[in-house]
Amino acid sequence: MGKVIVQDFTCKEPITMIGTEAGVCWGADISDQKKNYRRGIDCLESEHGRTFEFPDTYMILDGYSARVIREWYTHIGGSPTRLQASTRYIDYEHGFDYVVPPSIEKDEAASAGYKKVMTILQNALTALDAFGIPREDTALLLPLGMTTRIVCKHNARNLMDMSHQRMCSRAYHEYRKLFDDVCNALRAYSEEWAYLVDHYFMPKCEYMGFCKEKKSCGKMPHKE
């Protein structure tokens, strides 16, 4: 499956940054980093959401399906920025990589049929390329199951909001896996990101203590 790479441009001390920027607003002394950290914790606990928009993450998402990346793009709160690998530069000679969903992979006949279709598409793309058809046109044959690669920038508030929706047990399984990978990569990046992930990146039912979804999985009760 795919992997998440947190780039070095990412702020290593997001909580301290939140507290520092909030301190400017409050006319506080921002020369003491310990006080800035505590102020950042206060902002988080008080849900002063605007301050969460200061720390940015820069990540490479590599090896996930074009389908799940398309869904990743739909969550645009906080003005994220992203660039995706161009379909013009796919190596048709060696073919494209693709994702096989677990429900298909566990069935031998279904898996064989799925892979056969991918091979047919790869052969068709190679043939069209030989005819001199521009790749911007042949790319219309590329499937959503093809893996792709993007680089993206998101602030902490945007990622928290995404986690509440996309870590839900009813979310698309590859998206849940992708977000788990994001959480693990950020945990490994710094202690302050680990704190944010462990305390604020979770399904909204866990964050709120009740479920707001009409079609609940039953994990949490609906709000009375």
Regions found by a protein language model. Name each.
Residues 1-224:
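Family-specific signature for flavin-dependent thymidylate synthase
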